[in-house]
Structure formats: C-alpha cells, structure tokens
Amino acid sequence: MNLKQEKIAVLLGGTSAEREVSLNSGKAVLEALLKQGYNAHPIDPKEYNVANLKKDGFNRAFNILHGRGGEDGTMQGLLEQIGLPYTGCGVMASALTMDKMRTKMLWKAFGLPVADMKVVTRETFSELDPQAVVAKLGLPLMVKPSLEGSSVGLTKVKAVEELKSAVEYALKFDNTILIEEWLAGDELTVPVLDNQVLPAIRIVPEGEFYDYEAKYISDNTQYFCPAGLTPEREQALSTLVKRAYDAVGCRGWSRIDVMCDAKGNFRLVEVNTNPGMTSHSLFPKSAATVGISFEQLVVKILELSL
C-alpha cells in the first residue's frame, strides 16, 4: 500500500476546549507529511463537513483532534460510516477513555491499580458530605471533571472547607466529577506505539501539579526520559501500561498517564488516545529516545490507520 498516492486529510482544530493545542499538533503533523512527499491537507471540522471527505477525494484521515468531538468516538463513528480509514483508536476505545470515571472502573474490574475516588454528579452534589469524603480519602484531594481533557477544571483541595467550591468549579466543565486521593509520588506518562510500549517520561511541573499552563505554555516544566526508574520498575510499568491499553481496547497509538503514591506504587490515571504532537509534546520526546524521529513517528502512526 503506497500511502503517498493517497489524498490524506489531517483533521485538526475542531470545537473542543483543546482546539488551540490540536491546531498546533495538526500543523506539526501536516508539515512532517508534506516534507516527506505525502499529499496531505489540513481539515478543520469547525469549518468543513467531514462527512464530505470521501466525496472530495480523500482516502484516509490522520486524526489529531483533541477532546470532545474528535477524540470521544463521535468523529471515529462518522469516519467509519463514510468508510474512511483513520489513525488511532476506534469508536469504543475513544468513547470509553474520554470518560475517566468509567475507564477507571473498567481497569479496577481487571484488577489494575487506580486511585481511590468518590464520584459526584450535578444531581448528587447537594448530598456531598465533605467530612465523610475526607475521612475516606484523606487530604489533600484532587478534584477533576470526568470528561474534559488537558487538565481543564482541576483543583488541589488542601482543606475540607475547600471541597465544595472545587467541585462547583469542576461542574462548570462537566456533569460528573471525580474526587480522588492525592497521589504524592512521581508523575509518569507512557506512550504505546503499535503495541510496543515506549520509554516512560517523568514529569516535574513547576507548580503543584501538571495543569493546562504546565502542559502547553510553561517552559519550566521538566521532563525526564529515561524517567530514572530502575530497570525492574520500568519493566513493571511497561507491563502495567500494556495491560491497561489492551483492557480499554486501544489501537495504533495512545499515551497512558500514571501516578505514583507516596510509597511508589503505580496508579493508572487516564488514556490519551490522540496524544499531543507539538514541540512541547511527550510522545515525540519518548519516541526520539529509541531513535524514532518526529517525521518517522508521523508516518508510522499513519501506516497503522485502519
């Protein structure tokens, strides 16, 4: 299959809260494809009806949309309907992993380690008992929307009095909120490419946690790859991540975030099914340590499209 003879749509932008990040990722992917002689075109679903891709002569889509409408199964379903092969996870894995709560419940059912949590919805918010939550999960706590990506709507709660307002803030972004035990250990992210687990990256944010600012704007967030784990721990992490990837049905490529508790035990956090591909992005950083250039990575992801 010679993909250079195909007309490729690079899906970027979109309408989610992560539009800007997707535009940056898409630009980098598009440049890498054009540089290598691919017939690639930028397509922004905000301005173009993706249902017309096949009719307009496109053969394949490189989906680098982030967040709702691009990474949550809806775009995947549309592409399936028009019969256009696309990069990344399918409908089910994309929809499932967009929902952090249900992803964690599934992992838990598979016997995989996740943080202890309490789920609050818009409907149950009035019954929230901060004292009981703190008694069960301790302090500090992490409060986050279940569905929003890129660390939008997160709050670190250090006192019981702060819990309600943190949940109220998160409810601006989603109807389902997770209150989780605070994981005080290392923050790691682990890319998977074509069923191969790539080296983990350790993230050391300037602030208290890895939020939108640290992710996309700050140059003071530090990334370590290799992550400084012992070979045994790196292997254990790799095995855990592969099991987590398979449990939710990922394919092609994804990046899985993992936190350590104060004792160093791994806890699965979430799956990014369309990881960022900007200059700040972590997937390319990890791939580079095993000799895969950005251009090679983009082509590899494209070749894995189904």
UniProtKB/Swiss-Prot annotation:
It holds the Pfam family Dala_Dala_lig_N. It comes from Haemophilus influenzae (strain ATCC 51907 / DSM 11121 / KW20 / Rd). One of its GO terms (biological process) is peptidoglycan biosynthetic process. The lineage of its organism: Bacteria, Pseudomonadati, Pseudomonadota, Gammaproteobacteria, Pasteurellales. This is D-alanine--D-alanine ligase. Keywords: ATP-binding, Cell shape, Cell wall biogenesis/degradation, Cytoplasm, Ligase, Magnesium, Manganese, Metal-binding, Nucleotide-binding, Peptidoglycan synthesis. GO terms for molecular function: ATP binding; D-alanine-D-alanine ligase activity; metal ion binding. Mg(2+) 2 binds at residues 270, 272. The active site is at residues 18, 150, 281. The gene is ddl. SUPFAM superfamilies: Glutathione synthetase ATP-binding domain-like (SSF56059), PreATP-grasp domain (SSF52440). It is found in: Cytoplasm. Pathway: Cell wall biogenesis; peptidoglycan biosynthesis. Its cofactor is Mg(2+); Mn(2+). One of its GO terms (cellular component) is cytosol. Cell wall formation. Binds 2 magnesium or manganese ions per subunit. PROSITE patterns: ATP_GRASP (PS50975), DALA_DALA_LIGASE_1 (PS00843), DALA_DALA_LIGASE_2 (PS00844).
